[in-house]
């Protein structure tokens, strides 16, 4: 090939050889330089040029990476036809109910309950939730079901093994008998009045004895709290807590025995100094405070329970009043 002159220079024209990688043609001298460079660029992936980053350089504009588009979740097939049919059935059932109410005939049966197929049913409580709520609820309901089952096992174990206190105590059965030696009657449990007891002023002794016996028989039907109130009237040695003024004791009301509740509330009046006494039909009876702790029993004569404190007046288990030795 002959050389050609261009712009005062000589350019050699020879045979052009193609590149094996990109397919372009080069002179043999240039192809030696192009070969390794083209091979390197082909094996190495070229980075995309971000023009916005280059424009933001030297300015206050922050360079934010572009957000990648999220793939849209697949759409579920809509159940609009089923929902439409359920809606029509509900309207027809409501119209039939209104017509039956107007005519006064028999009410039609309610339509069957409908469930949304898109909801997920909880295996523990059988309720239905959407996907987001079901993921949170099922774990919570699982823990709740485990706790309830554990509580049920614990309650059955405690029922199978009752406490010793419930095994020891048995409430006494109220039995009436004519024999004087039995201790089942309420009057025999209370201390009997001694011969040196105080007599009521202005009232015959026969009436006092009859009233005390009638009160002793009525103690069986009263609650433990009423027994504690009525017990001081049965014996002369028992000293109740509350008192009445001497003026009330000298002039007793005629309807004391007829109205028990009124008698109990009005006949007990506490003094500010702490000493108490009670009156029934004008008679004064001393309380437990006057006795020393040595004269009082430590255990209940009815159920055998020990009194928690020395000044206890009633049994904390059965409610029977504490006797005096």
From Swiss-Prot:
PROSITE patterns: ZF_C2HC_C3H. A zinc finger (C2HC/C3H-type) spans 15-44, 118-147. This is Zinc finger C2HC domain-containing protein 1A. The modification Phosphoserine is found at residues 223, 292. Keywords: Metal-binding, Phosphoprotein, Repeat, Zinc, Zinc-finger. Residues 48-58 have a biased composition (Basic and acidic residues). One of its GO terms (molecular function) is zinc ion binding. Residues 177-188, 197-216 have a biased composition (Low complexity). The modification Phosphothreonine is found at residue 244. Its cofactor is Zn(2+). Residues 43-83, 150-260 are annotated as: Disordered. Zn(2+) 2 binds at residues 122, 125, 137, 141. Zn(2+) 1 binds at residues 19, 22, 34, 38. It comes from Homo sapiens (Human). It comes from the Eukaryota. Belongs to the ZC2HC1 family.
């Amino acid at each position: 090939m002959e050389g050609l002159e261009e712009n005062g220079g000589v350019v050699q024209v020879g045979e052009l050889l193609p590149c094996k990688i990109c397919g372009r043609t080069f002179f043999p001298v240039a192809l030696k330089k192009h070969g390794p460079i083209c091979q390197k660029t082909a094996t190495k992936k070229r980075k995309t040029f971000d023009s916005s980053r280059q424009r933001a350089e030297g300015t206050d504009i922050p360079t934010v990476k572009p957000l990648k588009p999220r793939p849209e979740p697949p759409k579920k097939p809509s159940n609009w036809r089923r929902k439409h049919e359920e809606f029509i059935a509900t309207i027809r059932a409501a119209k039939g109910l209104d017509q039956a109410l107007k005519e006064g005939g028999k009410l039609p049966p309610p339509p069957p309950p409908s469930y949304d197929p898109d909801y997920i049913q909880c295996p523990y409580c059988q309720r239905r939730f959407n996907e987001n709520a079901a993921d949170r609820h099922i774990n919570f309901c699982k823990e709740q079901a485990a706790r309830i089952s554990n509580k049920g096992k614990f309650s059955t174990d405690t029922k199978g093994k009752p406490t010793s206190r419930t095994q020891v105590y048995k409430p006494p059965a109220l039995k009436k008998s004519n024999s004087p030696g039995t201790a089942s009657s309420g009057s025999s449990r209370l201390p009997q009045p001694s011969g040196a007891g105080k007599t009521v002023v202005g009232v015959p002794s026969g009436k006092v004895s009859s009233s005390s016996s009638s009160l002793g028989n009525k103690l069986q039907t009263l609650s433990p709290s009423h027994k504690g109130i009525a017990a001081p009237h049965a014996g002369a040695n028992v000293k109740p807590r509350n008192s009445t003024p001497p003026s009330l004791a000298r002039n007793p009301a005629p309807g004391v025995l007829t109205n028990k509740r009124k008698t109990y509330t009005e006949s007990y009046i506490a003094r500010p100094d702490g000493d108490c006494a009670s009156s029934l039909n004008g008679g004064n009876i001393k309380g437990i405070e006057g006795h020393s702790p040595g004269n009082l029993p430590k255990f209940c004569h009815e159920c055998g329970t020990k009194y928690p404190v020395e000044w206890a007046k009633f049994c904390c288990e059965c409610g029977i009043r504490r006797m005096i030795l």
